[in-house]
Amino acid sequence: MINLTPGKIYHHTDITKAFDGQNEGGMRKSNTTNTLHLISDHTKNSPYRDVFDGDRVYYCGMGQTGHQDINGTQNKTLNESNTNGVDVYLSEVFKKTYYTFRGRAKLINKPYQEEQLDKNGDTRNVWIFPLLLIDEHQPINKSELAKTLEKRIKKNNKLTADELLEKIKSKKGSRKPGKRPTRSNYFQRDENIILYSLLRAQGICELCDKPAPFLKPDGEGFLEVH
């Protein structure tokens, strides 16, 4: 059993010491503690996009380019985690080098495949692992989720409407947006859909056909995407 408190934030050094294993990567196996530590890093502009829905996590497998292999490295470890004796844990990163520890996770359904874009922009098959978070913990700070979404929007802000539409279409098997418990419910939204909707609107509210009520600091009209 890993001696960390679910919901608490730990520095990279403390996390690495607790698991006594790899100190980088999204799926970190430790033979010493017989654990697999899954990292959902929201600070990186990576092709991985994990979906959180209440106490369930739809975790994207390992492999940034090409089709992912269910029998490759730690994908196999996670796929067999209900029978191989390896304990699975999960942490999230909202700020570099700091990990919000979520505690134990359990594979609750068979992994399935989705088509997504890899880091080179090529369509490929990825494996999605349906997980259940076992340990109780405090709800996520809603402001952290909002900041994460804003950062992803800024990273994709230079894409054209056609490029954004291609990213949206690539997620053919994607689930509905996840809903995360905060002090009020927070729906996990896709930044590409938000940006595409804003480009299409051209500063005009599609509900009332009026210009945006005010301008943001960068001079762009403020519109809320629903």
Task: Locate the predicted segments by residue.
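Acidic, glycine-rich low-complexity segments with interspersed aromatic residues
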Residues: 1-100
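A residue-level signal for beta-strand positions that form part of recognition/binding surfaces
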Residues: 35, 128, 222
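Generic secondary-structure microfeatures
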Residues: 42, 92-94, 109, 201, ...
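Conserved beta-strand residues within beta-sheet cores
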Residues: 87, 102-104, 194
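Compact mixed alphabeta submodule
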Residues: 94-153
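Short, charged surface segments at domain edges that flank catalytic/cofactor-binding sites
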Residues: 156-220
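Accessory, usually C-terminal, subdomains that scaffold auxiliary metal cofactors
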Residues: 220-226
